[in-house]
Amino acid sequence: MNAQHYNEAAAWTCRQTALSPGRRTMHAVDEASRWVSSAGATQVVTPVQAFVPGVVAHFLTHQDLPVTTELAVLFVDLADSTRMVVRQPPSQALRLIQRFTRTVTDIAVAHCGDVKDYEGDGALLYFASIAHATRAALAMQTALAAWPTSDGHVVQARFSLNVGEVTIGVIGSASRRSVALIGPTVNLAARLLKHVAPSGIIAPQTVVERLQQDALTLARAFRLQGTCLTMRDFEAQCVAAYSLPHPNGDVSIQRALLS
């Protein structure tokens, strides 16, 4: 991994937060105006490529893929979404999903992150820093709790974090292409999502250890979640899971959010 490319990519994502949504889209088109495939072939990029995530777009324009780099990932999943969808008209359910994804996206971008995929009623987000990812999760947790649905229920989501090496590569065919983030870092975060209650934030020990270096106050806010977990495809290791309480009334978490 070229450290210069990684630092430039991290700066690219944070640079977008200073732009208005319209300017950010146009800037993304400019940045991703050349698409570099794993075979080294270059293609003209249409405005649709504005949907290519920021850090990924940077790698596409600066070097061949695949490339392996360290990223923080955050999975966000709307809790109890089936109930909310089946109990209201599809158009109303769509508006809820749109509002949810808009909230998640705006907060991710404000914390130097970006969206890799919207997956059903959830999203896979990535960040150059685990501290940014954790603060984004807390901000999303607070924002979602502030607006009820039309039937009076509070909207809740589940959050899972991880940090580590991720391989970025192009998938698909010549007619339809996408970019994949592959590696145990992503898989473990996806598995952990099933072990957290609505509105909860869960992370493996790796995240807490990294936060101890980068954001100590935030690391101290995490609590060990019972005994370690044994999960499918991760049977060889006992995963120590940590949860982050809601910041309401917790001065240490509120301080960590602002630091």
Regions found by a protein language model. Give the residues of each.
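Structured catalytic cores of enzymes that bind and process phosphorylated ligands/cofactors
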Residues: 58-59, 65, 79, 84, ...
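Alpha-helix/helix-capping structural signal
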Residues: 79, 165-166, 187, 206
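Catalytic-core segments of nucleotide cyclases and related cyclic-nucleotide turnover enzymes
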Residues: 168-194
